[in-house]
Amino acid sequence: MPKEKNKEKLILDAAIRLFTSKGYQATRMSDISQEVGMSKGLTYFYYKNKEDLFMALTKKAFDQFKDEFREVYLSKGKTGLEKITDLVIRVVDFASKNQILYDAIINFMDLVKKYNQEESRKEIDPLILESQHFQKLLEIHHEPAKFGVMMVSQGIKDGSIRPELQPEITFYTIWSMIIGFEKMLGPVGYDGKEVKINPESLQPGFLKLLQDMLKGTIQASKPATVQTSLF
């Protein structure tokens, strides 16, 4: 079993290198076999097809992502708000250093959105649906976010985050903001843009806005009371 796991890892690591350098579409299973020095037949023994291999890669991505979230949550001497702030920095750093893995995570989110609806589920490649790794991902893809929810809950308890916020809704809102923030680093980093902003100024601005929202310095305005007469 250890030898088999090692071969699976060799194939997966080779796939990550080739998907990163050549792109997913341009990479063939034979390229991966050649990269790892293994017969094509043996490669197919461990992974049924490229789609199955990519789902295995996605599972690896979620496992590493969960480790990032766990490490932030378990860090000592920090408030919930400080942990959320650290998490933003860690996610962006993870995406920068492991772009193919981060992209796989975002791609899976799109797949789940399609999977949830019977009509759009038909648009998913059947080879993906057949992958045991895809089925496993359906079970575990919320696990990283569970640590984020616990960070928000901690912040509410320690007073660093507004007490009226609901932990699950709050974290998934934060999570969607982080995804959008990471995506915008490309456009704001483009030299030909006309807006006066760059990645170096966007990150501290994003963090301050997020902190202010969670601390409650940005309060929703209450509608003014309108007094009326019955007569």
What are the residue ranges of the model-derived segments?
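N-terminal positioning helix adjacent to the helix-turn-helix/winged-helix DNA-binding module
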Residues: 6-7, 14
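Helix-turn-helix
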Residues: 10, 18-60
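Short amphipathic alpha-helical elements of helix-turn-helix/winged-helix folds
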Residues: 14-18, 35, 94, 177
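Short coil/turn segments at alpha/beta junctions that flank glycine-rich nucleotide-binding fingerprints
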Residues: 21-25, 76, 98, 158
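Hydrophobic alpha-helical connector segments
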Residues: 56, 71-103, 167-174
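Amphipathic alpha-helical packing segments from all-alpha helical-bundle domains
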Residues: 82, 86, 112-158, 169, ...
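C-terminal peripheral helix-coil segments that are non-catalytic and often amphipathic
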Residues: 90-94, 146, 150-158, 172-231
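Short, solvent-exposed beta-strand-terminating loops
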Residues: 99-120, 176
